[in-house]
């Protein structure tokens, strides 16, 4: 099982590294012109990596990994909502600069997280990488939440005008579903989810440094 986990995390690391390298290279060569077609150049690989991340929930449910299910579920779900429900469904949003910024933040976090998880799967620890894994989220995660919120904000006019995912039913009962209201509710609840996930990540960080301090004393 350790071999399987290390291979899974290696695949994720390679995928996100390719995305990060592609985005960085395109920006260095084309400057701001690269922002507009970020989704068209790396969107398919990004979608593949996010679909693959469902396995991380299965790992927890099957007892392969001991991480908390709810924090992981919320992190996977928020990316699915933003990537597949919001960005993929609205072509006008795909060319926004905020999408490039969001993908950059996501992948800058993942190229740190996945090699750490890969090494942890085979009981290997590099202190610098471990410290970075338990510290970088303090900056990266709140920034990603802000970028996600702004992406939703930018998408609302398009969902409003195009009526994507909204519908009305006359029979057998009168029923109306207005999707922009759901996105607005999501924006209201998003800070609650962010605080919960940050508290879980902070607890992990605290436990790591406490263990490290005990080892030094011994």
Swiss-Prot record:
EC number: 4.2.1.134
A Pfam family recorded for this sequence: PTPLA
Spans within the Cytoplasmic topological domain: 1-6, 62-67, 117-136, 202-218
InterPro entries reported for this sequence: Tyr_Pase-like_PTPLA (IPR007482)
Primary localization: endoplasmic reticulum
Annotated GO MF terms: 3-hydroxyacyl-CoA dehydratase activity; enzyme binding; very-long-chain (3R)-3-hydroxyacyl-CoA dehydratase activity
Keyword Transmembrane: yes
Active site: 141, 148
Family: Belongs to the very long-chain fatty acids dehydratase HACD family.
Name of protein: Very-long-chain (3R)-3-hydroxyacyl-CoA dehydratase
């Amino acid at each position: 099982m350790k071999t399987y986990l290390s291979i899974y995390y290696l695949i994720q690391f390679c995928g996100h590294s390719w995305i990060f390298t592609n985005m960085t290279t395109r920006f260095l060569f084309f400057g701001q012109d690269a922002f507009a077609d970020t989704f068209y150049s790396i969107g398919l690989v990004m979608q593949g990596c996010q679909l693959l991340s469902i396995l991380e929930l299965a790992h927890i449910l099957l007892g392969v990994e001991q991480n908390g299910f709810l924090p992981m579920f919320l992190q996977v779900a928020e990316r699915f909502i933003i990537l597949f429900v919001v960005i993929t469904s609205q072509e006008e949003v795909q060319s926004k600069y905020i999408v490039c910024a969001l993908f950059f933040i996501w992948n800058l976090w993942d190229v740190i997280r996945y090699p750490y998880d890969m090494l942890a799967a085979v009981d290997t620890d590099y202190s610098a990488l471990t410290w970075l894994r338990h510290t970088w989220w303090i900056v990266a995660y709140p920034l990603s939440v802000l970028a996600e919120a702004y992406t939703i904000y930018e998408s609302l006019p398009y969902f409003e005008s195009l009526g994507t995912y909204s519908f009305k039913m006359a029979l057998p009962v009168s029923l109306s579903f207005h999707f922009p209201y759901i996105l607005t509710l999501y924006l209201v609840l998003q800070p609650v989810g962010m605080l919960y996930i940050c508290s879980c990540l902070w607890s992990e960080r605290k436990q790591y440094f406490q263990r490290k301090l005990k080892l030094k004393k011994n």
